[in-house]
Each structure stands twice: as structure tokens, then as C-alpha cells.
UniProtKB/Swiss-Prot annotation:
Name of the protein in question: Cysteine sulfinic acid decarboxylase
GO CC terms: cytoplasm; cytosol
Top-level taxonomy: Eukaryota, Metazoa, Chordata, Craniata, Vertebrata
Domain of life: Eukaryota
EC number: 4.1.1.29, 4.1.1.11
Enzyme class of the recorded protein, top EC level: lyase
Modified residues (N6-(pyridoxal phosphate)lysine): 305
Subunit structure: Homodimer.
Cofactor(s) required for function per UniProt: pyridoxal 5'-phosphate
The protein's annotated pathway: Organosulfur biosynthesis; taurine biosynthesis; hypotaurine from L-cysteine: step 2/2
PANTHER family listed in its UniProt record: CYSTEINE SULFINIC ACID DECARBOXYLASE, GLUTAMATE DECARBOXYLASE-RELATED
Tissues/organs with expression: Expressed in brain, liver and kidney.
Length: 493
């Protein structure tokens, strides 16, 4: 039968290719979308690694398989994967499945182009420029530059590299030999990519000076001043401050205006890592959390997080208008960036980045924005804040739940205190025993498949849960389920 032929025979057979893809898309709609976003279905189907290897039959063979077997494999891959679009997936800073963004991702994959020249990606070169222009306008810049990067970590690393190049342009050719000992500054609550970036760029992790944060996780500008003076006294040259708008755990927003004042006094590049909190700029009600961001030199913003644009969608935005990106990263590869092309070669943006091939990440955001409009996206942000407030009030009502602190963003950090520990906060082993609760409950919920929520210690604080209210399809019933499920899972502890 034709259906039993190995998949390789589909080459050159458009009818068979179309039939296969229709079946695959049917599986995607049924399993990943319909079931994957249904609260009555499991978030995950947990299996131990060895069992999962056996179930998936991962080993690659010399012979191709039948169409039916390939479809079974597609179904299995989805079945055993975590459903991040599920309304009870609270584990990461991204969640949800926007249908228009997904449509954009499907088109992107189908066209399979690279965003480096206008000749092979004309639609997306123009589209990226327009999307970046809109994002910059929300930051508060009428002009500037930018690029989509493969994740917020890379955006942060770009900012470090650009700040270094601006101060010491000879480093592009001469490398570290052209540099004195450099110092960059960031809060102890920053994303770990800042330290990784310093190591990756050859500055070394010792070049990262950690600035104190207050009890809410916000950088203390006075300590930033102190750290700058200390670095200078030790013979280092300060060149960059990385502030955070929306820290990973507590959801804190650094005081950008005060930090910008410090940077202005010392002539330092100000980068704002708004990968998590940048989308708040869309909300007229809450954008005050990022007051002062327009004074930054660069901003990292991940629409794949709170806007649910889908992985990956990460923008690096620059206030610079001097073509700094291209001057820093360009290498003028003659087989790509010929200067005698028949169109305006300024549209060939590929020399701005350190990559050659670059994925198209603008379409999903553009299509979602076209469908929702700025007003629809603003509602999405405001709704997340409203549900956060609902969760906070419910936590305060329920026995056995305790807030770590009042949130200012959509990160809600709290403890579940099981029956055996209630009223025993003064016991010497209370914190140690409380720290054991979250890992046990996490294992139980994952193996049961009912929900996923992250936990972590923080400083001297015992392990606590970090609830992220980000999925646009969340409703109050999902919040109620979260709290009720923790009570059910922890009633015997």
C-alpha cells in the first residue's frame, strides 16, 4: 500500500507531502492545541528518563519508516511533552498559546528563510524594522536601532559587547590586549546571563561588580555609587550598568531614573534588562514601573514572555543612531553583503549581528499585534495584574499560605505551610523543614500531571513557590485550582 512506503519516497510527490502535513497538522491541533490548552487534561505525562527513551524509541536507524509510524511518533512526541500552553502551567516566565502568534510561527517555519539580506527575506526585513520601531517608541525613543536576538541572554550579551566597543573600538581588532581591566555593575537579583556574558566575552566573571538590592529585590543606587568608586580605586575602568525591570524571582523593578543619574554622572552605558517586565510598557496603568527607561542606552525585551508571542521572540533595542551594531559586529562578507546590488544595501541587516543565519522572529509578534491591536495587548497585561491581585487576596484568606512579600508585578512568591508546621514558626528547625515542602509538592504535582509551578530558596528564605500569572487564558478558577491542589497534595505533610 502507498501509505506503508518509507517517508523518503515523498520527495517529489506533492500529493503525498500535502496528505502527510494535513495529518500532522491535525495531530497538532488535537493534541498540542485542543488538549494542550484544556484545563481538564494533564499538563504533563511524567516518565523517568529510561522509560521515556524506551517509549519514544529514540535511536536513529538506516531504514526509513512508514507514514503511519511517523504519525504515531508525532503524536507520541506531543503526548510526552510538557504543555506550556496549558492554563495550569505556571513553571516559567513564558506560558500560553496565542493562535495568531502560532500561525506566524508556522508560516516562518514553512518559508525557512534567514533574516540577513533583503533579497532572500524582503517581507521580514521590512517587518522587523517596523516592529522594532514600535517597540522603541514604547520605550520612548523616536529613533534608534535594534535587532531580534535568540533569547534575552544573548540580548544582554550584545549590550555588554556594544558598550565595550563604544568605549574601546580598538578591541574589535586587537581584542583584550586593547583593554584595561573593565568593570560592569548589576544587582544581585540580576539574570545570570550578565555573569555568563562577562565570561563569554572574555571580561571574566571578576569584572562583574554586584550591587546590593533592598528587601524587595531592587538595586540600591547608593551602593551602585559605592561600587563604582571601589572599582576605580582598585584600578578598573567602569563601563556599563545593567539594571533589571522585572527580576526573575521577585519580579522587582530597579529604580531606573536614580540609576540613570548615576550613569550620567560617571559616563556609563545604561542597559536595562526588561526581558520579563518590558511588556508592561503596553499598559497605561502599570507602565510607571519602568519610569526612566527612556534614559537607557539599550533595552532587552522578550515578547515571548508576558505577551505570549511564542519562543523565541527577543528584541535588543538601542537608542544609538550611529550604526553602532554594524560597526561593532560587521565583517563585510563579500558573498552576502555585496555593495553593488540592484537595491538599497542598507536593507541588508545581517552584518549587524554576530550570527550568519538568523531565524525570523518578528512575524509571530507582528501577526499577533495586528490581530489583537495595542488595546488587546494592553488588556492582556492589565488582566494579568488583576489576576495577580486576586491570587494575593486568596492567599491571605487561606490557612497554610503565607506571602513572601506583596508583589509589584505578576510574580507571586509564597509558602505553603503544611498542617504539621502550622503554629511552629519559632521551632529551631522550622526553616529547614519548610524548605523540604516545596520539592515534595513539586514532585507530586508533576507526577500527577495536574500543574507545574516553580520553587526556589532566596537568600536566607526557605524554599517558596513562585507563581507566574502570564497565560492569557487564565481565569480565577485556575487560581482557585492552584491553591486547592497544593492543599490536597500537602495535606499529609
Amino acid at each position: 500500500m502507498a501509505d506503508s512506503k518509507p517517508l523518503r519516497t515523498l520527495d517529489g510527490d506533492p500529493v503525498a507531502v500535502e496528505a502527510l502535513l494535513r495529518d500532522v497538522f491535525g495531530i497538532v491541533v488535537d493534541e498540542a492545541i485542543r488538549k494542550g490548552t484544556n484545563a481538564s487534561e494533564k499538563v504533563c505525562e511524567w516518565k523517568e528518563p529510561e522509560e521515556l527513551k524506551q517509549l519514544l524509541d529514540l535511536e536513529l536507524q538506516s531504514q526509513g519508516e512508514s507514514r503511519e509510524r511517523i504519525l504515531e511518533r508525532c503524536r507520541a512526541v506531543i503526548h510526552y511533552s510538557v504543555k506550556t500552553g496549558h492554563p495550569r502551567f505556571f513553571n516559567q516566565l513564558f506560558s500560553g498559546l496565542d493562535p495568531h502568534a502560532l500561525a506566524g510561527r508556522i508560516i516562518t517555519e514553512s518559508l525557512n528563510t534567514s533574516q540577513y539580506t533583503y533579497e532572500i527575506a524582503p517581507v521580514f526585513v521590512l517587518m522587523e524594522e517596523e516592529v522594532l520601531k514600535k517597540l522603541r517608541a514604547l520605550v520612548g525613543w523616536n529613533t534608534g536601532d535594534g535587532v531580534f536576538c535568540p533569547g534575552g541572554s544573548i540580548s544582554n550579551m550584545y549590550a555588554i559587547n556594544l558598550a565595550r566597543f563604544q568605549r574601546y573600538p580598538d578591541c574589535k581588532q586587537r581584542g583584550l590586549r586593547a583593554l584595561p581591566p573593565l568593570a560592569l555593575f548589576t544587582s544581585k537579583e540580576c539574570h545570570y546571563s550578565i555573569t555568563k556574558g562577562a565570561a563569554f566575552l572574555g571580561l571574566g566573571t571578576d569584572s562583574v561588580r554586584v550591587v546590593k538590592a533592598d528587601e524587595r529585590g531592587k538595586m540600591i543606587p547608593e551602593d551602585l555609587e559605592r561600587q563604582i568608586s571601589l572599582a576605580e580605586a582598585e584600578g578598573s575602568v567602569p563601563f556599563l550598568v545593567s539594571a533589571t525591570s522585572g527580576t526573575t524571582v521577585l519580579g522587582a523593578f530597579d529604580p531606573l531614573d536614580a540609576i540613570a543619574d548615576v550613569c550620567q554622572r560617571h559616563g556609563l552605558w545604561l542597559h536595562v534588562d526588561a526581558a520579563w517586565g518590558g511588556s508592561v510598557l503596553l499598559s497605561r496603568t502599570h507602565r510607571h514601573l519602568l519610569d526612566g527607561i527612556q534614559r537607557a542606552d539599550s533595552v532587552a525585551w522578550n515578547p515571548h514572555k508576558l505577551l505570549a508571542a511564542g519562543l523565541q521572540c527577543s528584541a535588543l533595542l538601542l537608542r544609538d543612531t550611529s550604526n553602532l551594531l554594524k560597526r561593532c559586529h560587521g565583517s563585510q562578507a563579500s558573498y552576502l553583503f555585496q555593495q553593488d546590488k540592484f537595491y538599497n544595501v542598507a536593507l541588508d541587516t545581517g552584518d549587524k549581528v554576530v550570527q550568519c543565519g538568523r531565524r525570523v522572529d518578528c512575524l509571530k509578534l507582528w501577526l499577533m499585534w495586528k490581530a489583537q491591536g495595542g488595546q488587546g495587548l494592553e488588556w492582556r497585561i492589565d488582566q494579568a495584574f488583576a489576576l495577580t491581585r486576586y491570587l494575593v487576596e486568596e492567599i491571605k484568606k487561606r490557612e497554610g499560605f503565607e506571602l513572601v512579600m506583596e508583589p509589584e508585578f505578576v510574580n507571586v512568591c509564597f509558602w505553603f505551610v503544611p498542617p504539621s508546621l502550622r503554629g511552629k514558626k519559632e521551632s529551631p528547625d522550622y526553616s529547614q523543614r519548610l524548605s523540604q515542602v516545596a520539592p515534595v509538592l513539586k514532585e507530586r504535582m508533576v507526577k500527577k500531571g495536574t500543574m507545574m509551578i516553580g520553587y526556589q530558596p532566596h537568600g536566607t528564605r526557605a524554599n517558596f513557590f513562585r507563581m507566574v500569572v502570564a497565560n492569557p487564558i487564565l481565569v480565577q478558577a485556575d487560581i482557585d485550582f492552584l491553591l486547592g491542589e497544593l492543599e490536597r497534595l500537602g495535606q499529609d505533610l
